Structure formats: C-alpha cells, structure tokens
Regions:
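Conserved catalytic segments around the Walker B and adjacent sensor/switch elements
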Residues: 52-65
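C-terminal alpha-helical "lid" subdomain
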Residues: 1-17, 31-32, 41, 45-49, ...
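A short helix-turn-beta junction within AAA+ P-loop NTPase domains corresponding to the substrate/partner-engaging
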Residues: 57, 156-173
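Mid-core helix/loop region of P-loop NTP-binding domains shared across ATPases and GTPases
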Residues: 73, 84-141, 174-182, 194-212, ...
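Pre-Walker A (Motif I) flank of P-loop NTPase domains
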Residues: 27-34, 56
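A structured, charge-rich N-terminal accessory region that forms the first stable segment of a protein
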Residues: 16-17, 21-26
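Sensor-1/coupling segment of RecA-like P-loop NTPase cores
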Residues: 34-40, 120, 134-158
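Conserved NTP-binding/hydrolysis module of P-loop NTPases
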Residues: 56, 69-88
Length: 246
C-alpha cells in the first residue's frame, strides 16, 4: 500500500474549498477562522496533516493535557519550522512567548495554522481566547478541526466566537466512489468491483475501517499471488529437462 497519499475524495475537495474561501476572503472585512468537523474515522486528521505538509501550513494538535503555555510553545515551534528557522525561543512567560508568535504572524500574513482536536479547548476559555486573538489581530488563517458536535459546542460556549467562523465543512461518510478512488491510487494490486463494493458496505463509509479492509485485501491478494508464483516456479523446475554431464 502506498503511503502518504491524499486522494481527491469528496471530503478532500470540499475541505479544500472551505480553506480556499478563507484564503480569498476580503481580509479587512472577515477574520480567517474556519472549522472542519465530523464523526470519528472520516479522515479529518489525515487530511489536516497531509494538506499541512503539502502546502506548508503550521499543524498543531491539542491534547487532553494542553494548556495555554503548552499551546504557545507548540505554536512558536510550528512557526519557526514554517519559516525554516532554528532554535525557537522557548523561554519566558506565556504572554511573552505568545507575543513573539504574534510578531512573526504579523510579518507573514499568508500563514495558515491548523489546530486539530480543538474539542480539548472547549473547557479552557483562555486557550480558546488565545486562538481567537490570532485571527482578531492578524490576517492569518486558523482552521479548527473537531468532532461531529464541535460546531454546536462552539456556538453554545461562545456565541461571539462562533460568529467569527467564516467557513465550515462537515466531513461525510466515504462513498463507494471515494473508496474506489482510494483503492485505485494506494493499492499495489488489482481489485474487482465486487471486492470494493463489499468493503464499502462493511465499513459503513467509515474511512478508517475501509483502509484496514483494503490493507487486508491487498495482503491477501499478494499472498495468493506469491503462492501461485511459487507453485508455478516449482512446476517449471520439474518440467525442465535435466542435461547429462558432458
């Protein structure tokens, strides 16, 4: 199975459009805040990490233990990597480090920052406020990535924060067409329409499950091909006439 590919499924196309809407927005009229959300297993994190790598975006991932300080440290490290600079200044107060981040962001208005697992910030008003300050005070784009209820949670927690989001996309279950395209681009073996239909049905459109099934299918096909080739080689050896020594 080929690794690291970002296949142009429906979700990828729509998520790209959601980001491009912010890239082309009137910057003085709209802040660059967007939200990608959806059920588990639909490829949100895969999309976020791979599009960040392809387009040189800053990718940050929150954790259950994330704090405003750990976020600012992660942010300044990501910004320095984006600028190809070494040794980010990791000393000072949270506010001092964040101020350095803002200085660099203000100097590079085209920067795009993806914050994955935003759900972990919903119980931390200060952390949410830190992210809001980025889009309120700079022309940078910040894409939040969260679970299926992230949009509703954000609206409940802070109506004014929610109003700042100018682009949304909810990831949907993978279609048969999506899984067919993925199989065609990432598998190193040929498959039948019946096999792909079966994977789509049994995965229920969950991309994570579908990828596991595709991997198992590829492994099985390769094993069968290897067994067949070995048997054919043995048959060929048996049929090859032995030459008498001169």
């Amino acid at each position: 199975m080929k690794q690291g590919k970002l296949v142009r499924t429906r979700n990828v196309v729509e998520a790209d459009e959601a980001i491009n809407l912010l890239v082309t927005r009137p910057k003085e009229e709209m802040v660059g805040l967007g939200l990608l959300y959806g059920k588990p297993g639909l490829g949100k994190t895969t999309y976020a990490t791979r599009i960040a790598l392809q387009r040189n975006y800053v990718y940050l991932r929150l954790e259950a233990t994330s704090t405003p300080k750990s976020f600012t440290l992660q942010l300044i490290t990501g910004i320095y990597n984006y600028l190809n600079l070494e040794y980010p200044p990791l000393y000072g107060t949270t506010n001092a480090i964040f101020r350095r981040c803002m200085d660099e962001i203000e100097r590079h208005e085209d920067i795009v920052i993806i914050v994955d697992e935003i759900d972990y910030a919903f119980k931390q008003p200060q952390l949410l406020g830190t992210i809001r300050d980025i889009v309120d005070n700079t022309a940078a784009i910040v894409i939040l990535v969260g679970m299926q209820n992230a949009r509703d949670r954000l609206a409940q927690i802070n109506e004014y924060y929610f109003d700042r989001c100018n682009s949304f996309y909810e990831f949907e279950s993978a279609s048969l067409k999506d899984i067919t395209a993925i199989a065609r681009e990432v598998l190193e073996v040929d498959t039948s329409p019946e096999q792909i239909n079966s994977i789509h049905f049994n995965s229920g459109g969950n991309l994570r499950k579908a990828m596991k099934m595709l991997h198992l299918l590829e492994t099985s096909i390769k094993a069968e091909q290897g067994h067949s080739e070995t048997a054919e080689q043995r048959k060929t050896l048996c049929l090859t006439p032995k030459l008498s020594p001169i």
